[in-house]
């Protein structure tokens, strides 16, 4: 098996979808394929590192050759959970199958009934109620809030209800109380959102509004123990890089490293590989593929971001020691050529690399992302309670 040797440091980076999910029709995502369509739009991608690892074997990707002797094990994974959001995908990687999905309101905004209930319980009206970036929503409604004291509420492609409030107009404790009220309302299965976020800001007018550090998240914690908890309880390091600590609400995390971009995330991962003698898992979420390019339906930008990632991946691989294991995978698709702005239900790649590997090949596709958590726990001889078997 790929994990027959013992690896001291395991590094998991998450990236992008490769189409063909068996249940794509249930999500109205038939025909989506993030990487294939980006390759077509960009007239081929130049990703020599991923190509040498064998990524081209996972589909028909213009510019990424199918090579006979890949340097890694490569395979396709299907998601078994209900949902195609960030939390669901990451939780499944670490062993949890979500049956009742988190609900997203990307294309519709929250229903009137939800908003009315929130307005009644908080005593203020709402404006916004669309999927929007944090800066744009403030430029659109900030001045209105200065005049009226109405809540600014908005969402994104993930399962979130965000409430923006100017710190001089609405006191922080009132904002936090409103978030608790929203969290309570959003426990209803019809409106079940993964997280409610307080988004306080300051500033005097359009173009001058800035968010403050007083953000607060009211997230649903994983509903059972994950592989991260199992590792932590057995005294292994679990380093969460990027959004990982938020996604797991800090559960099972022993060290947090914040990032501001893909490049920053990869640089910090390269630093970890170079300088941190940890024993356990480093779990990295690269934010830009999704936020900057997938949701904004910018295929060219996405392609350039994959090429940049490929350059940094080579540097990371050069820093790996003989007893390191690297996995590159994804939590969902986000086809930038598809309608709407939402994630897309797709298979995801799993590329597993170590300098110790003697034979490398394409493995059969598997039916859950949970094999990632299973394989990591198996390596460290930690009992795994989640879905999926070690490979």
Regions found by a protein language model. Name each.
Residues 9, 13-18, 301, 305-342, ...:
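Metal-dependent active-site segment of extracytoplasmic phospho-/sulfohydrolases and closely related
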Residues 148-152, 191-196, 269-290:
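Active-site regions of oxyanion-processing enzymes, predominantly non-cytosolic
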Residues 156-166, 248-251, 277-311:
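Active-site His/acidic residue clusters
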Residues 165-166, 173-242:
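Extended, H/D-rich, highly charged conserved domains that either
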Residues 168-169, 211-220, 252-263, 295-303:
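Glycine-rich tight-turn/loop motif centered on a GG-T
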Residues 342-383:
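Substrate-binding rim/cap in mid-to-C-terminal beta-strand-loop elements of soluble/periplasmic
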């Amino acid at each position: 098996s790929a994990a027959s040797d013992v690896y001291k440091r395991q590094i998991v980076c998450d990236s992008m979808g490769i189409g063909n999910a068996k249940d794509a029709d249930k999500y109205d995502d038939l025909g989506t394929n993030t990487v294939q369509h980006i390759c077509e739009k960009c007239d081929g991608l130049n990703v020599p590192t991923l190509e040498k690892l064998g990524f081209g074997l996972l589909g028909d990707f213009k510019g990424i050759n199918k090579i006979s002797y890949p340097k890694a094990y490569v395979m396709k994974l299907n998601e078994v959970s209900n949902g195609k959001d960030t939390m669901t995908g990451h939780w499944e990687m670490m062993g949890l199958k979500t049956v009742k999905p988190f609900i997203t309101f990307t294309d519709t905004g929250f229903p009137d009934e939800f908003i009315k209930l929130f307005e009644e319980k908080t005593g203020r009206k709402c404006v916004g109620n669309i999927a929007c970036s944090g800066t744009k929503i403030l430029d659109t409604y900030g001045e209105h809030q200065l005049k009226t004291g109405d809540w600014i509420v908005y969402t994104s492609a993930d399962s979130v209800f965000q409430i923006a409030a100017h710190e001089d107009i609405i006191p922080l404790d009132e904002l936090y109380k409103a978030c608790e009220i929203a969290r309570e309302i959003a426990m209803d299965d019809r409106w079940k959102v993964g997280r409610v976020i307080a988004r306080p800001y300051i500033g005097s007018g359009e173009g001058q509004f800035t968010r403050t550090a007083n953000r607060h998240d009211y997230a649903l914690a994983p509903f059972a123990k994950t592989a991260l908890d199992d590792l932590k309880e057995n005294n292994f390091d679990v380093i969460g890089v990027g959004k990982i600590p938020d996604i797991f609400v800090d559960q099972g995390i022993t060290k947090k490293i914040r990032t501001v971009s893909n490049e920053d995330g990869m640089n910090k991962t390269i630093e970890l590989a170079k300088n941190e003698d940890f024993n356990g898992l480093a779990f990295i979420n690269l934010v830009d593929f999704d936020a900057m390019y997938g949701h904004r339906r910018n295929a060219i930008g996405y392609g350039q971001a994959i090429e940049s990632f490929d350059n940094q991946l080579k540097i990371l691989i050069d820093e790996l020691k003989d007893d390191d294991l690297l996995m590159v995978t994804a939590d969902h698709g986000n086809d930038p050529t598809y309608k709407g702005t939402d994630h897309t239900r797709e298979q995801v790649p799993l590329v597993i690399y170590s300098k110790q590997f003697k034979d490398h090949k394409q493995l059969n596709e598997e039916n859950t992302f949970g094999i990632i958590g299973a394989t990591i726990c198996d390596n460290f001889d930690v009992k795994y309670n989640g879905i999926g078997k070690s490979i």
